[in-house]
Amino acid sequence: NLTNYDHNGRGLGGLMSEILKNVGPDIRFRLSSMEPDGVDDLLLEQIKDPRIFPHFHIPIQTASDRVLQIARRKYSISHVEYIIKKLREIKDDPFIGCDVIAGLPGESEEDAEITYNFLEKNNFSSFHVFPYSPREGTPLFNSKLKIEERVRDERAERLRELSQRQSRDYIFRQNGKMTEIIAEKNGEGTTGNYLKAKIIAPPSFAIKEGELYKGKFTSIFPLEVSIEV
C-alpha cells in the first residue's frame, strides 16, 4: 500500500511532488496499490504529470458503506467514486483496477448487489476477486456474522464474470489509441496502461530492451503496438 507512506506529515502526494521535481522527462512512474483513504487532492494533483503512467489499482474490498463500517475501514464509497472521477478527468481512459472480497462477514444479498452494481456502473478495467477467509489480527477475524461458503463462492464467481467482461471491453477500447510501451524480452512490452503487447517495428529496427517507445494499438487479439521509429 503506497499510500501508507508518511514523512513529517507529508504523504505519498508530498513524496511524488519532491520526486517529480528532481527527475528528468524520460523517467516513468507506476502507482500501483493505493488505499482510498490515502488518496488526497495533493496526490491527485501529482498524477496529472505525464511521467505517471495511466494505471491505478484501488483495493476497495466492498462498495457497501455498511460493510465497510463493520470491517472498520476508514473511507466511504463516495470517496472512492470521487477518486475514480478525478483519475478519469486527469488521464485519458486510464486502467483502473481494484480488489474486491466476496462474502465479507455481515454482507447481505443487498450489500453484494450494491458492490456488483458499483463495479459495473464505474466500469473498472479489471478487478481481483477474493472469497473471504478469516485472517488473524484483522477486525473481522472473530466476527460471528460469517457467510455460508456456498453463497460466498457464488458471489465471487459472479464478480469474476463481470471482471472478465469489463476487462475485455477495456482492451477493445484501446484499438487505434496512442500509448507508451516499455520494451521487454522477445519483442514484447508493457504499455503505460499495463497491457502486455507485441511490439511491431520495421525489420531493420532493433528494439532495445528497457527502452520506452511511443506507438499505437494496431491489433487487439493479439495485442500489438506499432511504434514510432
Regions found by a protein language model. Name each.
Residues 90, 110-152:
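C-terminal, non-catalytic macromolecule-binding modules
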Residues 31, 58, 99, 119, ...:
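Conserved, mostly hydrophobic/aromatic
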Residues 53, 125, 211:
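Short acidic/polar active-site loop segments enriched in Thr and Asp
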Residues 1-109:
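Conserved SAM/AdoMet-binding glycine-rich loop
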Residues 5-25, 71-74, 134-165:
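Radical SAM enzyme [4Fe-4S]-AdoMet core and its adjacent flexible, acidic
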Residues 142-229:
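Terminal RNA-binding accessory module
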Residues 63-64, 96, 134-139, 190:
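Short acidic (Asp/Glu) and glycine-rich catalytic loops that position anionic groups and cofactors
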